[in-house]
Amino acid sequence: MASSSSVLLVVVLFAVFLGSAYGIPKVPPGPNITATYGDKWLDAKSTWYGKPTGAGPKDNGGACGYKDVDKPPFSGMTGCGNTPIFKSGRGCGSCFEIKCTKPEACSGEPVVVHITDDNEEPIAPYHFDLSGHAFGAMAKKGDEQKLRSAGELELQFRRVKCKYPEGTKVTFHVEKGSNPNYLALLVKYVNGDGDVVAVDIKEKGKDKWIELKESWGAIWRIDTPDKLTGPFTVRYTTEGGTKTEAEDVIPEGWKADTSYESK
């Protein structure tokens, strides 16, 4: 009969085998990249996905809930962040400068990407799985496809303030399925920190703020027995603590699957 130590050894070896076979993380994620970590360049691995010149996901969306990320103002300069970058959705909308110096096709010049999707592949403490367009943007002019053919490379990154093109307004998308007793909001195009960590609404003529809960990605929601009629003022808080109010941005008679811009 096998000894208990022999059985334990077999179990351990089997666990190691399963870890190798099924991709149990071998490289733990790094510390979260916050809005206040500073401007030091850090090392990361980078890959790309989707069409070579596309915005990543087939539907031009992603785990943050944004749509049409191939169009302005994201314009396909998008990517997935791993755990310390995506942060269970709280990293959605944050901006990073990235650059590479190897292979030779790299320009060495930084470009800005927006976090719009999630990536949990455990290949490095920090990992950006970029759109094909964003990956190619790190190349010397004319060498975009040559760089994409590398597949995976080392890059340097740092978090930066988001600076959307002039005229871009913070936008609140009332998600599909919203009704007077259920409201889900996606907040996007936030300058500065870029990401949102809290959302509250206030009905016109009332003093009380109603806190929304995180749903998924960049979407916040509330279920209430009392009907929400609007107009609503929306207050959103970024990771750095900045609070901004968009007065009466959601009008009376609001509709689901509709976007409303701040004034």
Curated annotation (Swiss-Prot):
Designated name of the protein: Pollen allergen Phl p 1
UniProt entry tagged with the keyword Signal: yes
Main localization, broad class: secreted
Location of this chain's protein in the cell: Secreted
Subunit structure: Homodimer.
Disulfide bonds: 64-92, 95-162, 100-106
Annotated glycan sites: 32
Organism: Phleum pratense (Common timothy)
Residues annotated as domain Expansin-like EG45: 61-167
Entry keyword Glycoprotein: yes
Family under the similarity heading: Belongs to the expansin family. Expansin B subfamily.
UniProt superkingdom: Eukaryota
Signal peptide: 1-23
Gene3D superfamilies xref list: Expansin, cellulose-binding-like domain (2.60.40.760), RlpA-like domain (2.40.40.10)
BP terms from Gene Ontology: plant-type cell wall loosening; sexual reproduction
Domain Expansin-like CBD: 181-262
Any single Pfam family the record assigns to this protein: Expansin_C
GO CC list: extracellular region
Record keywords: Allergen, Disulfide bond, Glycoprotein, Secreted, Signal
